[in-house]
Swiss-Prot record:
InterPro entries: Trp_synth_b_CS, Trp_synth_beta, Trp_synth_beta/beta-like, TrpB-like_PALP, TrpB-like_PALP_sf. The beta subunit is responsible for the synthesis of L-tryptophan from indole and L-serine. It is an enzyme of class 4 (lyase). It comes from Brucella canis (strain ATCC 23365 / NCTC 10854 / RM-666). It catalyses: (1S,2R)-1-C-(indol-3-yl)glycerol 3-phosphate + L-serine = D-glyceraldehyde 3-phosphate + L-tryptophan + H2O. This is Tryptophan synthase beta chain. One of its GO terms (molecular function) is tryptophan synthase activity. Belongs to the TrpB family. Transmembrane segments: none annotated.
Length: 406
């Protein structure tokens, strides 16, 4: 976590104030400031503590099942007839997605800080499930805030959370999606600062959350880099990941940022198209503003009011993005592109039929970008796609959209 970086590196952020260039920071209520500073101090101490690292490593290995595999998607690659596509199989982790990586790190932090109550927000339910899972593992009560719309479209995950002992609180404000759930979680945190740890699920929020979530998720890219060198004897030409808040993406991207030969592509939710407001492509169609404690690219109207946005994928249905992604966009290191709902649905089906792997709708956005890019590349080229989660949670949504009666 603490390797020295070159002065011209893309890995130098954030600074002491939590800024990545003009993005990031700590825009929070005064009551939260002492807690934020306490968390920052606890994290600085923990990441330099060999015992903390050893405990996290043991849990990652024996509980979560790391390292996750880097799998050559031969069927999909041959179908597309271009670059060799590899999947980083985060769907094989305990709880079915990349979310467990961050939750294990943060629950250990909460323990060190003496917190006795866990709160979390969730969109697709994967972070809620992972939070409820680690809370159950360590015997702590867990409250998960989830938009009412998402509660409806992610019923299997709602049941899993309840089964794990968590209390799921539906949020009906706004569109009843991830932004609204995060608002409620922040309100809870402000009123319960003494005993409560807010386990944020994405690489956004006030500093130090974007940094610590990135660090806990960077295991994805660290492993993928080593695995591709073992399997191909070289670095990939392209790496691709879906971006909602951006934790799975920054986890894959960060270890590759200083590899100039590697093209990096983040895939946003283009929804029903960028012309109207039915999308969540904050970097393709938004502008900088402040939300949930940090300055970043946001979907907002002319008055600066945050728009609701839309995506077929509950996990990408967020009108902002982590501040490090905003900085990487402006610095030109990472390309961010939108994928439409129907393109993601097509990729969902194509992956299932060519690979026998049902991907999460979030991951299907990244696969859809691979479907566009791979045929334009030579067969000697190599691409890694982050398969951030499995699609069991999405089969009802997809079934309904395809006109099937499930």
């Amino acid at each position: 976590m603490n390797k020295p970086v070159a002065p011209n590196s893309y890995k130098t952020g954030p600074d002491e104030e939590g800024m990545f260039g003009i993005f990031g920071g700590r825009f929070v209520a005064e009551t939260l400031m002492p807690l934020i500073l306490e968390l920052q101090q606890a994290y600085e101490t923990a990441k330099n503590d060999p015992e903390f690292k050893a405990e996290l490593n043991a849990l990652s290995t024996f509980y979560a099942g790391r390292p996750s595999k880097l799998y050559y998607a031969e069927g999909l690659s041959k179908h597309l007839g271009g670059a060799k596509i590899y999947f980083k199989r985060e769907d094989l982790n305990h709880t079915g997605s990349h979310k467990i990586n961050n939750c294990l790190g943060q629950i250990l932090l909460a323990k060190r800080m003496g917190k006795t109550r866990i709160i979390a927000e969730t969109g697709a339910g994967q972070h809620g499930v992972a939070s409820a899972t680690v809370a159950a593992r360590f015997g702590l009560p867990c409250i998960v805030y989830m938009g009412a719309t998402d509660v409806e479209r992610q019923k299997p995950n709602v049941f899993r959370m309840k089964l794990l002992g968590a209390e799921v609180k539906p949020v009906s404000a706004g569109n009843g999606t991830l932004k609204d759930a995060m608002n409620e979680a922040l309100r809870d945190w402000v009123t319960n600062v003494e005993d409560t740890y807010y386990l944020i699920g994405t690489a956004a929020g006030p500093h130090p959350y974007p940094e610590l979530v990135r660090d806990f998720q960077s295991v994805i890219g660290t492993e993928a880099r080593q695995q591709i060198l073992e399997q191909e004897g070289r670095l990939p030409d392209v790496i691709v990941a879906a971006v909602g808040g951006g934790s799975n993406a920054i986890g894959l991207f960060h270890p590759f940022l200083d590899d100039a030969s590697v093209k990096i592509v983040g895939v946003e939710a283009g929804g029903r198209g960028l012309e109207g407001e039915e999308h969540c492509a904050s970097m393709s169609a938004g502008r900088p503003g402040v939300l949930h404690g940090n300055r970043t690219y946001l979907l907002q109207n002319a008055d600066g009011q945050i728009l609701e946005g839309h995506s077929v994928s509950a996990g990408l249905d967020y009108p902002g993005v982590g501040p490090e992604h905003s900085w990487l966009k402006d610095s030109g290191r990472v390309d961010y592109v939108p994928i439409l709902d129907n393109e993601a649905l097509d990729a969902f089906q194509l992956c299932t039929r060519t690979e026998g792997i049902i991907p999460a709708l979030e991951s299907a956005h990244a696969i859809a970008q691979a479907v566009k890019m791979a045929p334009t590349m030579g067969k000697d080229k190599v691409m890694i796609v982050n398969l951030s989660g499995r699609g069991d949670k999405d089969v009802h949504t997809v079934g309904k959209l395809l006109g099937m009666d499930i």
